[in-house]
Amino acid sequence: MQQPDIHFIPEMRRIRRIHFVGVGGAGMSGIAEVLHNQGYLISGSDLRESDVTRRLSAMGMTIYVGHHAKNVHGVDVVVNSSAVDEANPELLEARQQRIPVVRRAEMLGELMRYRHGIAVAGTHGKTTTTSLIASIFAEGDKDPTFVIGGLLNSAGTNAALGASRYLVAEADESDASFLHLQPMVAVVTNIDADHMDTYGGDFGTLKKTFVEFLHNLPFYGVAVMCGDDPVITSLIPDIARTVITYGFSEDCDFKAYDVKQESGKQRFKIKRPEGEPLDIYLNMPGQHNVLNATAAVAVATDEGIDDIAIQQGLAQFMGVGRRFQIYGDYPLPQGGSVMLVDDYGHHPREVAATIRAVRDSWPDRRLFMVYQPHRYTRTRDLYEDFVEVLSSVDQLVLLEVYAAGEEPIPGADGRHLSRTIRTRGLVDPIFVEGIEGVPAVVKDLVKPGDIIITQGAGNVGSLAPTLAKKKFA
């Protein structure tokens, strides 16, 4: 394999030492890893040690636990994310020392500037779609650089430096920082009301920002957009770039159809503007993943990747950590077994997609969900949607809201949400204050044949490994 160039970014020749504040985050760690592999001297800090920080340290990066002013001494630039408070001592010291401080997306934009960038945006499905594109491109011998918001199960990492000109990355709309990116291809999976504080609570502003992002494409660039999403279709007339649509709708350029579920796997066909329909096998359940795969096929076809590579890249895809990650089947002491699944989805639309995937693939099994709401503002803004979707499971254990740095909001906490769901009368939720109390509750309530899903974006992600280790004994 061709070795990637050291210092691939020509205009960053004056930069040697790069420090990441909050390096344990998925997006931050991926960029740090790519820059490290390009030969830059990378350091980073996070509030606590994690599997991610240990992995970065093992690669040779200097990783600090805790944020201290001295950590930025001698560095050339500091990278931070929107999750880092502006009063962070490292940011204050960097500005005091006149060290440039840039956002995560700005650094990603520099990585993309001199490459053929493929940026995947949208409220839901970014990580999986980005991963599927990277998988197809790798199978097609394109050897892409990729930066993904989750761990690729096949690679054990969320980023890699490839030798080709291709860079596949997520474009984060949560803080509007995706406007720093200037890709050649932009994918928009869907547009939903989320992170509305960034947009002043105005959905119109959110939509205009997506249009602005798409106009960062050069005039010869391509926007690949989901033709099933009504918000997206309403914006297409405003996009002064080539648009390729995908979805289940008849008028989409890339149309998925004839979907057949096979116990967590699925087969379907994709009609394309030219050539024969493409037969696809996907090792993941859910119609949302059919859409994600169809977006990846649209991008790959437009970039000239052959059909065999597309089919094999999808068939061999091993999934992404915490995206409907199946831990396996576990026997119960009383006989029978349960299947354990972990999923990152934390918006009502994402939770609904997970539930539908289970219902479609395992229609005769009981769905037992352990859900942790993420952010008080999201719980407040989408309260009724959460009540409706969570009422559709068979057994519900509800945790307190994972604050993610927010202050509690009266009426938007886990206990209040649990009461409202109980009042609707479709499911009787069990509220558990702390995550450490969940295994005992699950053990008492579980029944043979259950599919247990740990769901959410907070520390509920640590629960599935705990349950798997205890084996429900």
UniProtKB/Swiss-Prot annotation:
SUPFAM superfamilies: MurCD N-terminal domain (SSF51984), MurD-like peptide ligases, catalytic domain (SSF53623), MurD-like peptide ligases, peptide-binding domain (SSF53244). Pathway: Cell wall biogenesis; peptidoglycan biosynthesis. One of its GO terms (biological process) is regulation of cell shape. ATP binds at residues 122-128. One of its GO terms (molecular function) is UDP-N-acetylmuramate-L-alanine ligase activity. Its EC number is 6.3.2.8. InterPro entries: Mur-like_cat_sf (IPR036565), Mur_ligase_C (IPR004101), Mur_ligase_C_dom_sf (IPR036615), Mur_ligase_cen (IPR013221), Mur_ligase_N (IPR000713), MurCDEF_pg_biosynth (IPR050061), UDP-N-AcMur_Ala_ligase_MurC (IPR005758). It is an enzyme of class 6 (ligase). Keywords: ATP-binding, Cell cycle, Cell division, Cell shape, Cell wall biogenesis/degradation, Cytoplasm, Ligase, Nucleotide-binding, Peptidoglycan synthesis. GO terms for cellular component: cytoplasm. It comes from the Bacteria. It is found in: Cytoplasm. Cell wall formation. Belongs to the MurCDEF family. PANTHER family: UDP-N-ACETYLMURAMATE--L-ALANINE LIGASE, UDP-N-ACETYLMURAMATE--L-ALANINE LIGASE-RELATED. This is UDP-N-acetylmuramate--L-alanine ligase. It comes from Teredinibacter turnerae (strain ATCC 39867 / T7901). The lineage of its organism: Bacteria, Pseudomonadati, Pseudomonadota, Gammaproteobacteria, Cellvibrionales.
